[in-house]
Amino acid sequence: MRGEIDEANLAPETSLINKENQDSSATITTTLLLTTFVAVSGSFVFGSAIGYSSPVQSDLTKELNLSVAEYSLFGSILTIGAMIGAAMSGRIADMIGRRATMGFSEMFCILGWLAIYLSKVAIWLDVGRFLVGYGMGVFSFVVPVYIAEITPKGLRGGFTTVHQLLICLGVSVTYLLGSFIGWRILALIGMIPCVVQMMGLFVIPESPRWLAKVGKWEEFEIALQRLRGESADISYESNEIKDYTRRLTDLSEGSIVDLFQPQYAKSLVVGVGLMVLQQFGGVNGIAFYASSIFESAGVSSKIGMIAMVVVQIPMTTLGVLLMDKSGRRPLLLISATGTCIGCFLVGLSFSLQFVKQLSGDASYLALTGVLVYTGSFSLGMGGIPWVIMSEIFPIDIKGSAGSLVTVVSWVGSWIISFTFNFLMNWNPAGTFYVFATVCGATVIFVAKLVPETKGRTLEEIQYSIGYVEL
């Protein structure tokens, strides 16, 4: 049994230091921008993999003569690979470091895209898709954690949310390119951001907090100074990280079993709860049914998807800009409320289809609901759960906890993906009313349990959560 963390004893000795200079490093340096760009190249790969299957379905099935079952396996095996990658991601990142883990992930993605490009039979498509999915699963943990660990507290939320923005861009760019080029060339293009990141990893620093965790103190100082700028005073931040890390060395490395000790209860409930509510709030249902809804509204699916992109990217960008100004909680509350309204409108549109006088207006109500949901989800619920996941767990259990939270997210994604058609056959309106109820529950969950992490160091956040008795 691991020892319980005493919040008072973990309070940093550096708290007595004059704090006037602690924010002096909260500036955007060239190294910080470059490092973030390299990291989120992996997020773009993530988005490209998600967006690949939709535009290539027709050409791919015709050229390789795939059955419906074979193409369904090709689409779903990505999630299976991602679940396995997510389960292993935390331990890998703790063992070899955040930077090396991104390189490890990219090797799987490159091999996967290459296998898809060279495929002449279904089995190689599935192998390639599985490999890319595995890389995605690793990325979904390591990228937001790495960005959270390298950025100053005043910039951390916005920079970490760029992960979600690049996923959106990856999906959108791949979907648009897939409308004009063949599936093999699209797979080759998918390798470009992989190569960009692989090259960039040679010039960016490792996470200073991981270096401190493994006792590489000299490299820790060098990495932190590079990220904050050569003229920045890093003494307060450096001392706080060192003090916190040294006190945690008295505790053994956290495992999955250790996560269920009382002192981690609140962090676990918040991290897992946000991911469950995110996935069961209907995001995949909206995504899967969007084209049909657009067609029922008299809008072509291509124009409809472009409309979603037009809403999604600006709203995600707005979330990035507001993250460190308005805070995480207000954005989550607004976002969850908006997704609740969006799902309710879609559900209502299905209900009104049976009212003859209103059936024509119902399709436009569905279109409005989809766009309201998409914009609201992009503002907060899409990215903020990943930001909070990267902030609330202490370094000694971050690998195990992050893996658990990420696996929960992917399992939830698979459950909704698998059951959605069955739910729609059962009751289309009822399906979206259920999603609306989950989104409403998210508002209550955020209001009651989710802490505000804006403007606080990772160490301060973890002190404040403290010991929670179940």
From Swiss-Prot:
Matching Pfam families: Sugar_tr (PF00083)
Keyword annotations from UniProtKB, A to Z: Membrane, Sugar transport, Transmembrane, Transmembrane helix, Transport
Superkingdom, taxonomy of origin: Eukaryota
PANTHER family noted in UniProt: PTHR48021, SUGAR TRANSPORTER ERD6-LIKE 5
Family, similarity comment: Belongs to the major facilitator superfamily. Sugar transporter (TC 2.A.1.1) family.
Annotated function: Sugar transporter.
Gene Ontology cellular component list: membrane
Protein name stated in the entry: Sugar transporter ERD6-like 5
